[in-house]
């Protein structure tokens, strides 16, 4: 059975944000929202008209580290566990998706996700015509959305848009259960890791880190702090009840939908 996954080579990533932009175009992601993000660490400087840059790094060399992140399509996905209406689910091929007709906008999935990979449409989504070129239907107000591994492309035998449009070839996509697939060979050959693996989520996205710039390992606490920068996600976490390993694992069922006798 097919089990899709992704390898991101941080030694190749140049922080160009092409993955973020092509994702928005392909999936008609609303203005102000991003499914793909590239976090940046280091290299603080001021770009002045005189070109005066403060020194940084060893020998005065400015260094940058880039951490691409999106939905990790976890095998043990906490977002799937906490959804009270089963709107978030895992497909047979391992891709985690959302049924927008079922989504009630409770945002428990946002509270549960340790990667802050989901966004909520608080208002009626706005799109610029030049930004949306994909065939994916726009999501309505009041639902959560996120990366889908471009499942509409995958079903047609194509790679996700972020993979195809990465100018540095830093992304490798394929079947994790096929030992002969390129993505499986990368995982077997290189020293890969999963983000926040201590959470027990078992992501389907793997990262290659090196000791050389630009790719260098990020400490878990630093990464978790960077990921947790969305006010809606933090507010949802505060409303969560039972928390285990950093995310809510208790299914929340609205009283009006709960089963049982009156």
Swiss-Prot record:
InterPro entries xref list: 4Fe4S_Fe-S-bd (IPR017896), 4Fe4S_Fe_S_CS (IPR017900), DsrO-like (IPR054822), ET_IronSulfur_Cluster-Binding (IPR050954)
Localization annotation: Cell membrane
Disulfide bonds: none
4Fe-4S ferredoxin-type domain mapped to chain residues: 4-34, 62-93, 94-123
GO cellular component: plasma membrane
Residue numbers binding [4Fe-4S] cluster 2: 23, 147, 150, 162
Cofactor dependence: [4Fe-4S] cluster
Amino-acid positions noted as binding [4Fe-4S] cluster 3 in the UniProt annotation, renumbered to this chain: 71, 74, 79, 113
Induction cue: By anaerobic conditions. Its expression is under the control of DmsR.
Residues holding [4Fe-4S] cluster 4: 83, 103, 106, 109
Record GO terms (molecular function): 4 iron, 4 sulfur cluster binding; metal ion binding; oxidoreductase activity
Region of interest called Disordered, as start-end residue ranges on this chain: 209-262
PANTHER family registered for this protein in UniProt: PROTEIN NRFC, PROTEIN NRFC HOMOLOG
Main function: Dimethyl sulfoxide (DMSO) reductase catalyzes the reduction of dimethyl sulfoxide (DMSO) to dimethyl sulfide (DMS) during anaerobic respiration; it can also use trimethylamine N-oxide (TMAO) as terminal electron acceptor. Subunit B is proposed to be involved in electron transfer.
Descriptive protein name: Putative dimethyl sulfoxide reductase iron-sulfur subunit B
């Amino acid at each position: 059975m097919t089990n899709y996954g992704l390898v991101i080579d941080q030694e190749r990533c140049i922080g160009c944000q092409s993955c973020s932009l092509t994702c928005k175009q392909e999936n008609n992601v609303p203005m102000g929202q991003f499914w793909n993000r590239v976090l940046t660490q280091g290299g603080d400087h001021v770009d002045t008209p005189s070109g005066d840059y403060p020194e940084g790094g060893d020998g005065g060399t400015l260094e940058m580290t880039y951490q691409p992140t999106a939905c990790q399509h976890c095998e043990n996905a906490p977002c799937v566990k906490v959804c009270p209406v089963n709107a978030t689910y895992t497909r047979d091929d391992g891709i985690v998706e959302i049924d927008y007709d079922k989504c009630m906008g409770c945002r428990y999935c946002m509270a549960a996700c340790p990667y802050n990979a989901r966004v909520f449409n608080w208002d009626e989504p706005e799109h610029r015509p030049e930004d949306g070129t994909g065939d994916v239907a726009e999501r309505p107000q009041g639902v959560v959305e996120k990366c889908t591994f471009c499942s509409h492309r995958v079903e047609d035998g194509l790679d996700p848009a972020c993979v195809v449009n990465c100018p540095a070839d830093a992304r490798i996509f394929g079947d994790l259960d096929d030992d002969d697939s390129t993505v499986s060979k990368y995982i077997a050959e290189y020293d890969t890791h999963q983000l926040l693996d201590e959470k027990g989520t078992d992501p389907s996205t793997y990262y290659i880190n090196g000791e050389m710039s630009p790719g260098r390992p990020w400490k878990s606490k630093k990464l978790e702090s960077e990921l947790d920068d969305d006010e809606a996600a933090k507010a949802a976490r505060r409303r969560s009840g039972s928390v285990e390993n950093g995310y809510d694992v208790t299914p929340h069922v609205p009283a009006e939908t709960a089963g049982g006798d009156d």
